């Protein structure tokens, strides 16, 4: 956050990525959202489950190599998406929202089906926004 104050530009901000915060062992809940809210430009949702024997790994700046499994955003056992959506509602988030998950998507039909399922999931978690559009 100190760097944001130094940069001090209205078009420069943060992307809130709870899954990556979780991989790094950082809190991603309400306290974090309150701190980041004034600087957030996008919410980027994906879902991971930490697993020492997981098939995917990434080097992190604070925990070294971390192994995990990719999960669909609606699956439990990874990011607490209920808490994330409740927190976004509490801070009044009405900005951009991106969902990322390439795992298991190999065809255009796979992508359309996944996008539709994601849209339904997001609609079920947001209050007053039944107009979420699948592009």
Segments (PLM) and residue ranges:
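Histidine-acidic metal/acid-base catalytic patches
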Residues: 2-12, 16-135
């Amino acid at each position: 956050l100190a760097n944001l104050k130094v940069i001090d530009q209205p078009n420069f901000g943060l992307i809130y990525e709870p899954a990556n915060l979780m991989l790094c062992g950082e809190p991603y809940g309400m306290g974090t959202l309150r701190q980041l809210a004034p600087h957030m430009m996008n919410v980027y949702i994906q879902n991971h489950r930490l697993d020492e024997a997981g098939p995917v790994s990434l080097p992190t700046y604070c925990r070294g190599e971390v192994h995990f499994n990719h999960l669909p955003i609606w699956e439990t056992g990874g990011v607490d998406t209920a808490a994330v959506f409740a927190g976004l509602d509490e801070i009044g988030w009405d900005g951009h929202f991106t969902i990322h998950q390439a795992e298991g998507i190999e065809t255009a039909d796979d992508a359309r089906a996944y996008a539709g399922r994601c849209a339904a999931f997001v609609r079920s978690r947001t209050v007053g926004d039944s107009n979420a559009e699948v592009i």
